[in-house]
Amino acid sequence: MVMLMEQFIGIVKDILVLIASFGILLASYRLWIEKDRKNIIYARIHILGVIDCACFLIFIALGETLLAFVYLILAPFLAHAIAHAAYNDNLSE
């Protein structure tokens, strides 16, 4: 029974990693094909937020909970810093 449960948990982890990886690929593709327009940097930061969520799920699935929570805390600060710099410095693509 224990062995069956471990196999089930392993399968669930693999499925979670596949779904999150697909999300990363889809978001990266969307990031790549997006045309330049006004305030595109904010849209790109949003897409990177989607990638961050997928990476968080992958870390959880791989059993790296401490790394996942550190990533979950630091990633929004980094995105905010980039957006704040773009707003204050009027960055253009």
From Swiss-Prot:
Major place of residence: membrane
Membrane topology: Multi-pass membrane protein
Cellular location(s): Cell membrane
Transmembrane regions: 8-28, 54-74
GO cellular component, as recorded: plasma membrane
Top-level division of the source organism's lineage: Archaea
Alphabetized NCBIfam families for the sequence: PRK06286.1-3
Protein name as it appears in the record: Uncharacterized protein MJ0292
Organism: Methanocaldococcus jannaschii (strain ATCC 43067 / DSM 2661 / JAL-1 / JCM 10045 / NBRC 100440)
